[in-house]
Amino acid sequence: MNPVCLPDEKQGKTGVRETKMEDKKMAVTASMVKELREMTGAGMMDCKKALNETNGNMDEAIEFLRKNGQAKAEKKAGRIAAEGIVMAEVKEDKAAAIVEVNSETDFVAKNADFQAYVKAVVNQALTTKAANMDEFMAEAWNEDAAKTVKDVLTEKIAVIGENLNIRRFEKVETEGCVVSYIHGGGRIGVLVEADTDVVNDEIKACLKNVAMQVAAMSPKYVSRDEVDQDFLEHEKEILLAQAKKE
């Protein structure tokens, strides 16, 4: 580049100053912010910041949000997630899964985005081969095999803005019949499995009634034969004490 002589007082000793082309930043438009928000689910201001930081590069902006979301999720991980919902899914009466996913507030538990996420988690549990929570969190996410269940949870924490926790899951597979029952808008969930050669509406209605009874009474055992003797003696003591007071 040729030097250009500029007749001003800032020329320096030689009276010559070199000019350089400045890098031009791409203007971030509302449509770009909207597109990034639809792709990631992040907030509008977060999307705008990501685009500004990456000079409007959409792929780099997504990566920026993911990294930023990871940091946010780690900060939220220590907060108590005491609310949430229980959700169940049954497939062809032969397989079922039930999950409990916690949030910090009841407001988020009722949020459509959160409930859609829990729906995806229970569908994941329906096909899982995991024997425990660690294995479940490490397995590939059904909707995007490039991510793990834990990766998606971390992203969802960043989007929703609360600590979330997949607390527990159960999966049932049977040659008979399995039904589910969810009570109180997701406060209580029950799966009931039965050995049966016949599966029809009457059988399923009967099992549904059993599931409702389980939700109401929270029994610890299925039959008398399973009752632990120490537990039985303890309950007898309580009943005798109550009877004496009456």
Predicted regions and their residues:
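NTP-dependent nucleotidyl-transfer catalytic core
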Residues: 18
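Residue-identity detector for glycine
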Residues: 12-15
